[in-house]
From Swiss-Prot:
Subunit structure: Interacts with the retinal-specific guanylyl cyclase GC1.
Residue segments, region Disordered: 401-442
Function: May be involved in the trafficking of signaling proteins to the cilia.
UniProt cross-references to PROSITE patterns, sorted A to Z: ANK_REP_REGION, ANK_REPEAT, ZF_MYND_1, ZF_MYND_2
Major subcellular location class: other
InterPro entries named among the record's database cross-references: Ankyrin-MYND_dom_contain_2, Ankyrin_rpt, Ankyrin_rpt-contain_sf, Znf_MYND
Protein name: Ankyrin repeat and MYND domain-containing protein 2
Comp. bias regions, Basic and acidic residues: 401-421
Keywords attached to this entry: ANK repeat, Cell projection, Cilium, Metal-binding, Repeat, Zinc, Zinc-finger
Amino acid sequence: MVHIKKGELTQEEKELLEVIGKGTVQEAGTLLGSKNVRVNCLDENGMTPLMHAAYKGKLDMCKLLLRHGADVNCHQHEHGYTALMFAALSGNKDITWVMLEAGAETDVVNSVGRTAAQMAAFVGQHDCVTIINNFFPREKLDYYTKPQGLDKEPKLPPKLAGPLHKIITTTNLHPVKIVMLINENPLLAEEAALNKCYKVMDLICEKCMKQRDMNEVLAMKMHYISCIFQKCINFLKDRENKLDTLIKSLLKGRASDGFPVYQEKIIRESIRKFPYCEATLLQQLVRSIAPVEIGSDPTAFSVLTQAITGQVGFVDVEFCTTCGEKGASKRCSVCKMVIYCDQTCQKTHWFAHKKICKNLKDIYEKQQLEAAKAKSEEENNSKLDVNSNCVGEERLEEAETRICQKNDNPKDSEEGEKESLQSDAGLEGLQEAAVGPQVSEE
């Protein structure tokens, strides 16, 4: 491989860097076809065109450069940054995913010893952190699609690798979401297919725990998905309407407050069944969840999500009540209290929500009244403060006016001086009287 020096750019390469920032994909494609353009050329800071495109959030440019052979793991930047680090810093989830799929290494550190995930966390790009932490290379899954050793057939049929990889790399661990992903794919929504999938999940879990660099987080995630698969198998065996019954069971709330008890129990059960009792992560989860009564915060789902995906709980975003998807924005038109991603999730949850919708509506109206009352009181208090300040300023102005008037009148000042002299003389007499006769030195 020819060594590329920093800053030694041809005119066409300089134009390429400009086009990445301000031009079109077509212009970049034309320049990349030139013999004078090296796809991995370095500017004076050691940045490649791919790094520029990643940092500027140009997804199509990144895909174009990767198709032309851009090195996703180039490490020539003056501070040791990689294309994945720039993608994570930009906060673009799609570009971060593209870099990972192209083979970007996640454990490379920069000059201050930070990985791409740590850099993203430092600048508050938590979605990118979650994507990086939950990424699982497709090659590692494809290993199970080929017969190994004395096996006559692979442990995982090749046709299941794609759908299974989608579930493995999801950042949403809500059990309803996982069941929905299974249900929407006919290849997965069969008992035989799920049997093979959950066994592969268990093998990956075991490998994560027994390898030299133990990965407890990935092992716990694989085990959790395996437990959901096994629950789906049980419902496919016993019920004719397939997985719809399981989804309803997971969403059904108790009469008092609508809390999904069955969902909480399934998540707690899956954590309890983790086969490696000595794992630090398992002990942390148990300590966090065990003292909490079912129905209280934190829920098992929130604790598990934070442990596996690294999502922070204090971020002010809304989650779908049905599937737990982040960024839901559609509210129930009646109660305004429950949020969904789309109409499908709303219809799925309606059987449970309709029982408490009226009560939630009353709570919402009460909250609105209290908020309006508090706002009016705050406005009244601010008006009183303004009025009192005005009165105080008026009094201060009056006092200043009087002082000025006294200073302007010379007679008053002379009389004041005389009075002060007389008072001083009187004070001297009082002092002499108080002292009394003195003993002379003679």
